[in-house]
């Protein structure tokens, strides 16, 4: 028999931990301004959706093998990603994109720019969630967006052709599938593809290293929430009076609401992945103070600069700094131009370390005197610089004693304080001799 008291006692800490986690998740969601970002992305999506569809159609028209695939892909997207109310929206967008394909070269270029701005806005939002202030620049940014706008449609078309082949194969396999495994596979296939799409979005869009295991967990959870949203949204629309109030115009506010909710789920998934990463690397972040962490990071940069190599996110994480901790310090280092981000997404040293002091590093991270005097336990990853730092810490303690080694009687007498302060430099010079 189960001991109910023991079961409750074992479950209670887990429930509290889960509650704290989702409480922090909601707090991060609000603090990062995800609701406002979702509204902005909804507004941008209305302008970018037609250009994106026009670009997709243009890419498919360049390859005769994909003839007719564009319409199939559009039908598949609206059947799996938009509730039942999206049929009218699909027709409107198809008409708009058809007209967009008849534009002049200047008009087509403007549409491509609109789609490009949509992608940059998405990246900025994800970077804000991850605390990354430096966006992709130069050739890296161009290649990423070019791949999305050109190779992306072709990959989707290839995937659709493969799914068509599987559907034809399904007819043959069904004759031999007595237990219905094939039907089960095809019923969950949209969930698998949606999970893969969200995982790729969470892992590739932010301009930082995102652990793939956390991106995968976030992608699956977001896909599940997305499917639940489709069901719930369809039920609400079917049982509401939108059509009676707005008539044929009801499709516009409903579609706006749907896109806004979709972006909120996507941004919530991004915050979830970030929160998972923060908790997963919390033990690494807490082992170093900010000062010791930035010294450890700069030691890595110095070692890499000797051989002309650049530094990756993984180099700093493997040094024990911690992913989230490293991202926080990276923002400060890039703001002060101590390090720079290359077009490949790696990092190089910008300052001559012979001109940088430990005091400069302490001011960079806002370290206090107590943190300077405190030396954490030495770890196997630390270099020889740690011993020299400990010596300086002892000298700092002696210097602090010289400044604060006065009696309270003298402290409370302003005249004696002035005399002692005048004598301090002479005493320190004699001590140094």
From Swiss-Prot:
Transmembrane annotation, as ranges: 46-66, 103-123, 142-162, 185-205, 217-237, 247-267
Which segment of the chain is annotated as a signal peptide? none
Keywords for the protein's UniProt record, in alphabetical order:
Cell inner membrane, Cell membrane, Membrane, Transmembrane, Transmembrane helix
Cellular compartment(s): Cell inner membrane
Cellular component GO terms, alphabetical: plasma membrane
> Is-annotated flag, keyword Metal-binding?
no
> Known InterPro entries for this protein?
UPF0761_bac, Virul_fac_BrkB
The record's family statement is: Belongs to the UPF0761 family.
Tell me the protein's name: UPF0761 membrane protein Sde_0901
Species this chain originates from: Saccharophagus degradans (strain 2-40 / ATCC 43961 / DSM 17024)
């Amino acid at each position: 028999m189960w001991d109910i008291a023991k079961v409750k006692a074992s479950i209670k800490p887990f429930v509290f931990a889960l509650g704290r986690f989702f409480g922090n998740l909601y707090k991060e969601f609000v603090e990062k301004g995800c609701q406002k970002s979702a509204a902005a992305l909804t507004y941008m999506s209305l302008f970018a959706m037609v250009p994106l569809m026009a670009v997709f159609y243009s890419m498919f028209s360049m390859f005769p093998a994909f003839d007719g695939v564009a319409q199939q892909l559009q039908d598949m997207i609206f059947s799996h990603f938009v509730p039942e109310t999206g049929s009218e929206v699909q027709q409107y967008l198809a008409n708009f994109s058809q007209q967009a394909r008849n534009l002049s070269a200047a008009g087509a270029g403007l549409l491509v720019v609109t789609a490009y701005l949509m992608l940059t806005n998405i990246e900025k939002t994800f970077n804000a969630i991850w605390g990354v202030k430096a966006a992709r620049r130069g050739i890296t940014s161009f290649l990423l967006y070019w791949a999305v706008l050109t190779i992306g449609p072709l990959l989707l078309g290839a995937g659709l052709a493969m799914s068509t082949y599987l559907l034809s194969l399904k007819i043959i396999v069904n004759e031999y599938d007595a237990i219905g495994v094939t039907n089960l596979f095809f019923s969950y296939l949209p969930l698998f593809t949606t999970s893969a799409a969200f995982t790729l979005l969470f892992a590739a869009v932010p301009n930082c290293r995102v652990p793939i295991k956390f991106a995968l967990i976030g992608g699956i959870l977001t896909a599940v929430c997305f499917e639940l949203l489709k069901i719930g949204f369809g039920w609400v629309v079917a049982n509401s009076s939108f059509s009676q109030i707005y008539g044929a115009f009801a499709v516009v506010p409903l579609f706006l609401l749907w896109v806004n909710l979709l972006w909120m789920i996507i941004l919530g998934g991004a915050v979830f992945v970030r929160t998972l990463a923060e908790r997963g690397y919390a033990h690494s972040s807490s082992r170093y103070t900010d000062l010791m962490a930035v010294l450890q990071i700069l030691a890595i940069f110095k070692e890499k600069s000797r051989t002309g190599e650049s530094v990756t996110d993984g180099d700093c994480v493997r040094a024990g700094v911690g992913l989230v901790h490293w991202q926080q310090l990276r923002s400060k280092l890039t703001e002060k131009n101590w390090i720079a981000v290359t077009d490949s997404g790696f990092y190089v040293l910008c300052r001559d370390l012979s001109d940088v002091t430990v005091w400069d590093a302490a001011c960079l991270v806002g370290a206090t005197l107590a943190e300077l005097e405190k030396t954490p336990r030495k770890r196997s990853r630390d270099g020889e610089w740690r011993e020299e730092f400990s010596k300086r810490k002892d000298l700092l303690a002696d210097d602090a004693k010289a400044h604060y080694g006065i009696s309270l009687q003298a402290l409370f007498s302003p005249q004696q304080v002035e005399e002692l302060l005048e004598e301090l430099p002479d005493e320190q010079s004699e001590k140094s001799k």
